[in-house]
Amino acid sequence: MIELIPAIDIIDGKCVRLSQGDYGSKKVYNENPVEVAKEFEANGIRRLHVVDLDGAASHHVVNYRTLDLISSRTSLIIDFGGGLKSDEDLIIAFENGAQMVTGGSIAVRNPDLFCRWIDRYGSGKIILGADVKDRRIAVNGWKDESTCELFPFLKDYTQKGIEKVICTDISCDGMLAGPSLDLYKEILAEHPTLYLIASGGVSSIADIEALHEAGVPAVIFGKALYEGRITLKELQAFL
């Protein structure tokens, strides 16, 4: 069964969503992310994707207190991303309750450091973030496009020990227009043992069913849940 991973994106300690990574499109859904996390947990959700959007823009972890509150008041398994640029950032994330961390920009800008994290903490704790725009990896809170192409990027890091990848098609994220099924099928055809976590575009329970049928191991979703297009009750079929 596909693993369900709701997302809580944080700006100024509040639960927000963006469209295509545009900070100007910010919409606040709840002033208290802990309330959101507790509601997820009460409905059978076991894992959470927490993104520090302030951190992603500032190049260092910012909303670690919110991470600590969520982790201390729920039993959710949390993977945390946004602003992880140094050993200190990683320690802050783990000390404040993250069980896993996701590195995207760092894997492009400082691959030596990212590989040290893989070696030190193991592939169970370090997730590769592959945020894609026109098949190239985007960095710095999606504001910049790198020269890294997706498939060589994935091949390189799977050879270095990465086993889990969150792949977000930026053109889909927050648009409620459906996920990039063909892209995910292509990735799994090339990397059949990869724990691929699809992210971006989920608009309905049918999208989750389609990802499940395509063999995608896990899915991150947010706006569809916050906008009421998917209900927590509907998700019970996958739990």
From Swiss-Prot:
Any GO MF annotation of the entry: 1-(5-phosphoribosyl)-5-[(5-phosphoribosylamino)methylideneamino]imidazole-4-carboxamide isomerase activity
Active site annotation, chain numbering: D9 (proton acceptor), D131 (proton donor)
Location of the protein in the cell: Cytoplasm
One record GO biological process: L-histidine biosynthetic process
Entry keyword set: Amino-acid biosynthesis, Cytoplasm, Histidine biosynthesis, Isomerase
Amino-acid biosynthesis is among the record's keywords: yes
E.C. number: 5.3.1.16
Catalytic activity field: 1-(5-phospho-beta-D-ribosyl)-5-[(5-phospho-beta-D-ribosylamino)methylideneamino]imidazole-4-carboxamide = 5-[(5-phospho-1-deoxy-D-ribulos-1-ylimino)methylamino]-1-(5-phospho-beta-D-ribosyl)imidazole-4-carboxamide
InterPro entries from the UniProt entry: Aldolase_TIM, His_biosynth, HisA_bact_arch, Isoase_HisA-like, Isoase_HisA-like_bact, RibuloseP-bd_barrel
Pathway the protein contributes to: Amino-acid biosynthesis; L-histidine biosynthesis; L-histidine from 5-phospho-alpha-D-ribose 1-diphosphate: step 4/9
SUPFAM superfamilies reported in the protein's UniProt record: Ribulose-phoshate binding barrel
GO-annotated cellular components: cytoplasm
Pfam families from the UniProt entry: His_biosynth
Similarity-based family: Belongs to the HisA/HisF family.
HAMAP family listed in its UniProt record: HisA
Name of the protein in its database record: 1-(5-phosphoribosyl)-5-[(5-phosphoribosylamino)methylideneamino] imidazole-4-carboxamide isomerase
Name of the gene encoding the protein in the UniProt record: hisA
